[in-house]
Amino acid sequence: YNQFEYTYLCIKSILENSGDVAYEIIIADDCSTDLTTKIDEIIHGVHTIHNESNLRFLRNCNNAAKQARGQYILFLNNDTQVQADWLAPLIELIERDDSIGMVGSKLVYPDGRLQEAGGILWQDGSAWNYGNRANPDEPEFNYVKEADYISGAAIMIRKSLWEEIGGFDERFVPAYCEDSDLAFEVRKHGCKVMYQPKSVVVHFEGISNGTDTTSGQKAYQVTNQKKFLEKWQQELQENHLPNAVDPFRARERSVHKKILLMVDHYVPHYDKDAGSRTVYQYLQLFVNQGFSVKFIGDNFFAHQPYTDTLQQMGVEVLYGPYYAKHWKDWQKENGKDIGYVFLNRPHISVKYIDAVREFTNARVIYYGHDLHFLREKREYELTGDAALLQSSADWEKKELDLILAADMAYYPSYVEEQAIHEIAPQAKVKAIPAYLFSDVEECEYHFDKRKDLMFIGGFGHRPNVDAVKWLANEIMPALVKKLPDIRVYILGSNPPEEVKQLATENLLIKGFVTDEELQEYYQNCRISIVPLRYGAGIKGKVI
C-alpha cells in the first residue's frame, strides 16, 4: 500500500538478482493513492492487480494469489530488497524433498545485522525472531533447518498446498500472525517448513504499518497473537517449549529429535580422500535418519565448498575464531541436549573425549578409521626403523584408552576388530562398512576394450606416497620392458614433489580428479592397482 519508492526498488532487486529462474511478478496494489497507481506504466512485464477498495494485507495476499500461474507462490513484502542469487536456493530446497511444503529466506536489516534466521514460537504463543540483531554470517544462522515459522516478508509455498490449505486464515484479518498460522497449517497437512540461509533478503520492516503495537494496524499484532494461541494451544503445548527455555532445540524444531555431534580433523573433503568420504556418508546417513547433526572440525576452518555442502544438507558446522576458542563453553552450555558424540581418529578424539564426558551425558562412539599402531608396526617390519616400533607402542596405548573410554568403537575391517579383541577382550568394538552405497549404476565392463592401469589415493597419507615410489622404482621398469606402450595413471589429491618427479611417458601423475573424472578412469582402465607395502583398515581404493 503506497510507498512507491520501496516497491520500485524491490522489483528492481528482483530483476537484477534472480538469475535464470523462470518467474512472474504479481504486484498486489491495495488501493494505493501514490505513484503506485501507475506502476504498470513504469515497470513493464509485471502483472498488476489494482484493488478497487482497500482489502488490507491478508485479503490482498489471498486475492492476488488466485492469479498466480506458477508451481510455487512466493510472498514478498514491498519493503524488501532481495540479494544476489536469492531465488534458486529456495527452489532447490523445496524441490529436494516432497515433504517440504514451505521455505523462507534469511532476513537482514538494512544496516547488515540479522533480523531473523527462522522464527521460534513458544507454548504461550509468543514469538522470537531467532538471531535478531546478531551477525548474519555466524555459523548458527547458516545451515538449512526446520523452523516453527518464517516471517511472511519472504516465504515460498507450493501452490497446490496453498490451495489445499485455503490461503491465509481470515480470522487474522487484517494482518499479523497469518504467517505463523500458515506454517502451522503446512505442518498440519503433513509438510515441513524450512529455513534457507543462502536466500538473503533485506527487510526494512514496518514501512506500511509502522512499529507501534498500541495503535493503527500494528495493534492487530497483539489481538491476533491471542487468536493464534487459542487456535493452536494444543499443538503448542505438545510440541513447543515454555518461553525462552532451550532455544538451542527450539530454533530448529528438534524438541523431539536426537542430537548428534560429529568431530573430525576438518570438514570432510569427500572428493579427496577415503576417510573424508566415509565421514561425509555417515553424516548423510544421520541426517536422513532424522538426527539433528552438529559438526566440529578441529581446525575450525570453513573449507569450501565442503562446509556449504554440509550446511545445505542440514548440518550445523561450528567454525571461526569464536568456536576455536570457546568450543568447550559451547559443549558446557548445550551438552544436556547432545545425545550422541561421534569421534573420529585417535589424534583428534583424544582432545575432545574428556570434555564430552564432563559436559554431556552422550553415548560416545569412536571411529578409528584404522589402527595406527598396526599400520606403524607393519611399516617397522618393512623398514626396520626402531622409532616406528616405539611410535606403534605409543599409538597402541592411546587407541586402546580411547576404545575403552567410548561406549562403542567402530572400525571398517574385521581385522581391526579381531586385533583389538586379542589385546582387550572386554572392548566393545565392531566392524562397520566404510562406505554406504545406494542406486549404484550398472556398468558394462567389456574388458577386451579396456587398456591401461590406474592407482588412486590421497597423498596426505604416507603409505600412498611409499606405494607410488615403490611402483615407479621397482615395478615399472619390468612392466615397461614387457609392455612398452603401457600407461599407468596416478590419481589423487596433493601429490608431493617427490611423486611428481616420478612421472614418465608410461607413468602419468594426474593428481586430483573429480568424482566424474574418476568414474571415467574406472570405466576405461583395465586394472586398478594397489601397490601398498604397509597400512591398516579397509582401502577405499579397493572398494
Language-model segments: residues:
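Conserved donor NDP-sugar-binding/catalytic core segment of glycosyltransferases
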Residues: T80-W122
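Acidic donor-binding segment of Leloir-type glycosyltransferases
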Residues: L15-S53
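Short aromatic/hydrophobic "clamp" motif used to bind/position activated sugar donors
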Residues: I73
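Short, flexible, basic/aromatic active-site loop/helix in glycosyltransferases
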Residues: S105, P110, W122-D148, E163
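Acidic donor-binding loop of glycosyltransferase active sites
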Residues: I338-G339, D407, Q523-I538
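A short, conserved alpha-helix in the catalytic core of glycosyltransferases
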Residues: D85-I91, N142, E146-G166, R171-V202
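Glycine-rich, basic loop-to-helix element that forms the pyrophosphate-binding segment
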Residues: N51-A68
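Conserved catalytic-core segment of nucleotide-activated headgroup transferases in glycan assembly
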Residues: D271, G275-Y280, Q284, F295, ...
